[in-house]
Amino acid sequence: MSKVLILFGSSTGNTESIAQKLEELVAAGGHEVTLLNAAEASADNLADGYDAVLMGCSAWGMEDLELQDDFAPLFDEMENMGLKGKKLAAFASGDMEYEHYCGAVPAIEEKARGLGAEVICEGLKIEGDASSDPDAVSAFAEDVLKKL
């Protein structure tokens, strides 16, 4: 059994719905899961005590990538989270009309790799909430579970 932190930033509730579904699926896989809203989190040693971290954040922007307001400060301080040696996967909801559709996924993955985290599967990108593409959410959870 692994201890898994699911950290999310959500403005409209779409990313939160994905995080909640992932919490349900990962817990059903026999793992201890903590769901944490970025609005209630501090970057300092956030990953301590966890084997894996799933990070979800909505993003948008026509020219520059804009991360969700509560998640952006945590992203800026990711080096303080203690991610070195941790397993990590990223997920996002987005709107395909924006140039940076689900741009949080590659941004999180790139920064996490640079900090010594192991990105364990391809990130999940969904337009809308968890009910928009339940098969994609389930497949992502299965990929994560295989690597825990």
UniProtKB/Swiss-Prot annotation:
Function: Low-potential electron donor to a number of redox enzymes.
Entry cofactors: FMN
Cited SUPFAM superfamilies: Flavoproteins
GO MF entries: electron transfer activity; FMN binding
Domain spans labelled Flavodoxin-like: 4-145
Protein name in the entry: Flavodoxin
TM helices/strands, residue ranges: none
Entries under InterPro entries matching the protein: Flav_short, Flavodoxin, Flavodoxin/NO_synth, Flavodoxin_CS, Flavoprotein-like_sf
Record key words, sorted: Electron transport, Flavoprotein, FMN, Transport
PROSITE patterns: FLAVODOXIN, FLAVODOXIN_LIKE
Keyword Membrane attached: no
Family classification: Belongs to the flavodoxin family.
Keyword Transport: yes
